[in-house]
Structure formats: structure tokens, C-alpha cells
Curated annotation (Swiss-Prot):
Origin organism lineage: Eukaryota, Viridiplantae, Streptophyta, Embryophyta, Tracheophyta
Organism: Arabidopsis thaliana (Mouse-ear cress)
A GO BP annotation: cell division
One Pfam assignment: Cyclin
InterPro entries membership: Cyclin-like_sf, Cyclin_P/U, Cyclin_PHO80-like
Stretches that traverse the bilayer: none
Binding partners and assembly: Interacts with CDKA-1.
SUPFAM superfamilies from the UniProt entry: Cyclin-like
Family: Belongs to the cyclin family. Cyclin U/P subfamily.
Official protein name in the record: Cyclin-U2-1
Keywords for the protein's UniProt record, in alphabetical order: Cell cycle, Cell division, Cyclin
Tissue specificity remark: Expressed in roots, stems and flowers. Expressed in the shoot apex, leaf primordia and young leaves.
One MF annotation (Gene Ontology) recorded for this entry: protein kinase binding
Length: 222
């Protein structure tokens, strides 16, 4: 995993001052961490498949041809063209984890991982950030037809039961998990995007819990 070891002081500095528009060539460290996690998951699922056969019954994200691009390169491409902040990738990771837990017949594999990533990152971007690209743009970045990505988004939302809410404590716990994943390697860290956490907290205050899922649906479908 190509990450740069940083001190706590540098981490705090990056956390509060990291600018994607001013420094467009700097890839967030969370991308390396997330790609490493997914690569390990792919390897584990491949071993399970060889031992027990099959990759599960949920095949909604399967593609006919496996993209000739590593997970790291694919995530870097998404960042390069969307400038999605670190918090988007953390929330996408939350969604992927929830999806796998809620759909026991699904396993991440080479045939579905790229489509799963572009779909969850797009949805997470809509949930986290104020300004977003259209689905057609995300489709172009991800190498899909717009209609295909629209269908994947709807399938994902229904399979998730529209449970997209990520509160501050959940967000922080996943950040800590990602940090623990790389701490063994010598003090690696990821950006947690404090602004995102504060925005999520403010939304919790203004949103009516009784209408929460309807509100999320309106955000996603815009």
C-alpha cells in the first residue's frame, strides 16, 4: 500500500487544511487504505469460492467484462475527475459494509467490485457533499452507460432499504477502523474530514426522524 507515514501534528494539519481544488494532484490517503482493504477482501473471497464454489446469489453488480484497472487506479480515477473528499470514501465504505451484511448472498469479486465502488461513491457523494455531478458524469468516469448506473443506484437503494443515514459516531468508528488497518504498518493515518462530521451532526438536528428516509430519497434521486 502506497501511503506516507505522518506524525500526529501533520495529520491534524492535513485534516483541517487539505484542499482538493488547490492541490488536485494529491490523492487522499484513504484511497490507498480502502483499496488495500478491498484487495484483501477479494483475495479472501477468491479462496472461499475455490473451496466452496460460487460467488453468491446476489449478482446485481456483475459485469460481462472485468475492467482492466486495479482497485487503486480505479479509485484514483474517480478522485481525479470528481474531487470527492475523503469523507465520501469513508461513507461509501460504510455503505459497502452494510450492503454485504444485509445481503448475505453477495460477495465482492472482480466481476462486481468496480460497479459497486462507483455506485456507492456516487451515492455517498450525494449524501455528504453540497455540490455533485450528474449520474451521467459519474457513469462516464466509471466506464458505464448512464442507464446502467441509474439502474444500479436504484437496485442498491432498494437492497439497502434506503438506510443511508450515517451519524457522527458511526462515521468516526469507521475512520478508526481504517486507521487501525494501517497502524500496524508504522503510523499511517487517513483524513477524516471534520467538516463532514459537523455537517452530518447539523443534519441530525434539523431533520425530522419520522421523515428521514423520504428526505434521503429526495436527495439521491435529484
Amino acid at each position: 500500500m502506497d501511503s506516507l507515514a505522518i506524525s500526529p501534528r501533520k495529520l491534524r494539519s492535513d485534516l483541517y487544511s487539505y484542499s482538493y481544488q488547490d492541490d488536485s494532484n494529491t490523492v487522499p490517503l484513504v484511497i490507498s487504505v480502502l483499496s488495500s482493504l478491498i484487495e484483501r477482501t477479494l483475495a479472501r473471497n477468491e479462496r472461499i469460492s475455490r473451496s466452496y464454489g460460487g460467488f453468491g446469489k446476489t449478482r446485481v453488480f456483475d459485469c460481462r467484462e472485468i475492467p482492466d484497472m486495479t482497485i487503486q487506479s480505479y479509485l484514483e480515477r474517480i478522485f481525479r475527475y470528481t474531487k470527492a473528499g475523503p469523507s465520501v470514501y469513508v461513507v461509501a465504505y460504510v455503505y459497502i459494509d452494510r450492503f454485504c451484511q444485509n445481503n448475505q448472498g453477495f460477495r465482492i469479486s472482480l466481476t462486481n467490485v468496480h460497479r459497486l465502488l462507483i455506485t456507492t461513491i456516487m451515492i455517498a457523494s450525494k449524501y455528504v457533499e453540497d455540490m455533485n455531478y450528474k449520474n451521467s458524469y459519474f457513469a462516464k468516469v466509471g466506464g458505464l452507460e448512464t442507464e446502467d448506473l441509474n439502474n444500479l443506484e436504484l437496485e442498491f437503494l432498494f437492497l439497502m432499504g434506503f438506510k443511508l443515514h450515517v451519524n457522527v459516531s458511526v462515521f468516526e468508528s469507521y475512520c478508526c477502523h481504517l486507521e487501525r488497518e494501517v497502524s500496524i504498518g508504522g503510523g499511517y493515518q487517513i483524513e477524516k474530514a471534520l467538516r463532514c462530521a459537523e455537517e452530518i451532526k447539523s443534519r441530525q438536528i434539523v431533520q425530522d426522524p419520522k421523515h428521514h428516509h423520504h428526505h434521503q430519497f429526495s436527495r439521491i434521486m435529484l
